[in-house]
Amino acid sequence: HSQGTFTNDYSKYLDTRRAQDFVQWLMSTKRSGGITXXXXXXXXHADGTYTSDVSSYLQDQAAKKFVTWLKQGQDRRE
């Protein structure tokens, strides 16, 4: 149950973070006067790649912390 709760909370965090990143990107695009369609596709792809890389990194870190937490819990039971 705790793993499901952790996963659900983490998924919500990632969704919120992606939404914040997208809003920030929109705001910076508006401030800069917009971008061309070709540059928009390249920038959106780069932003998506960056977001994907960050998400993967955060998921890896969360998984490592969770495994460590599980191991510590097992040590206490023994």
From Swiss-Prot:
One of its GO terms (cellular component) is extracellular region. Its main location: secreted. It is found in: Secreted. The keyword Iron does not apply. The keyword Secreted applies. InterPro entries: Glucagon, Glucagon_GIP_secretin_VIP. Signal peptide: none annotated. One of its GO terms (molecular function) is hormone activity. Induction: Produced in the A cells of the islets of Langerhans in response to a drop in blood sugar concentration. Keywords: Hormone, Secreted. Belongs to the glucagon family. X's in the sequence were included by homology with American goosefish sequences. This is Pro-glucagon. It comes from Atractosteus spatula.
